[in-house]
């Protein structure tokens, strides 16, 4: 049984296709697209804001444990849905885990550096600095896969670099440690996206069905991250902190952490749903536009000190992200 059914509608081309001889139902399809897009935007924004709340407002100093708990929640839910027959996942064989382990190391590093950077940097600047990932990915595609980008893409990437540099210079709450973690996160995120496709192709060859759906990848990534996360948590001396902190004795804190785990899984589900109801181009553009309300919410909710120059740099970076998304659309078309 699948969670989402496909109605044979290609919204990217503006076409409505009949299903089984029935009359076209564009209103229903557009409502689904709107609902899935709204769910994706809410879950992705909420995830970052809740993580920021846990790390900064609660002053929780165990980012690796937070990631570990979130992934554990995801594993429990995915396994439960699979046992109920609501979703289909591939068996986690030893061969499959061996193939996936290298990319999982990058995945864990990506999550951990994101946690560490979010603790020290305000949400708006994190969203702008994440644009650097696009620059690294574009350069990586050019050198690794001989993929050429047109001038509009490079112009948008140049605008992203300017916005990131100017944003850092004008950031009133600048923190060098946080910026270092975020730059590391950009390199790891780009590495993950560059290696994921090849790893997926290899992994499909060792699965029982010859495929690897999104639910299987969520289960595979999160399951493999648990032992690695435990080792890193011990290496960073988080165990001593966890033993001493009074936060773990607060039911409200566990509720917030569990919510963050549910939101992490919700992003996976809603992104698949939204992508299924619309297409890659709309998904990419909405993802860029989604950073605008996220940045505003981050500044307002956490009382971030800002200046006109820094606000302008942030806005410039967000606009550059939208320009980049549109340039990529035209490049693909």
Swiss-Prot record:
Effect of deleting the gene: Dwarf phenotype, necrotic lesions and a constitutive hypersensitive response to salicylic acid induction.
Residue spans crossing the bilayer: 33-55, 62-84, 99-121, 153-170, 174-196, 216-238, 253-275, 282-304, 308-325
Main location: Golgi
GO biological process, alphabetically ordered: defense response; GDP-fucose transmembrane transport; GDP-mannose transmembrane transport
The entry's keywords: Antiport, Golgi apparatus, Membrane, Sugar transport, Transmembrane, Transmembrane helix, Transport
UniProt-recorded Gene Ontology molecular function terms: antiporter activity; GDP-fucose transmembrane transporter activity; GDP-mannose transmembrane transporter activity; nucleotide-sugar transmembrane transporter activity
Topology in membrane: Multi-pass membrane protein
Keyword Oxidoreductase annotated: no
Pfam assignment, any one: TPT
Coiled coil: none
Localization, UniProt: Golgi apparatus membrane
UniProt keyword Transmembrane helix, yes or no: yes
Family to which this protein belongs: Belongs to the nucleotide-sugar transporter family. GDP-Mannose:GMP antiporter (GMA) (TC 2.A.7.13) subfamily.
Name this polypeptide is given: GDP-mannose transporter GONST1
Organism: Arabidopsis thaliana
Name of the coding gene: GONST1
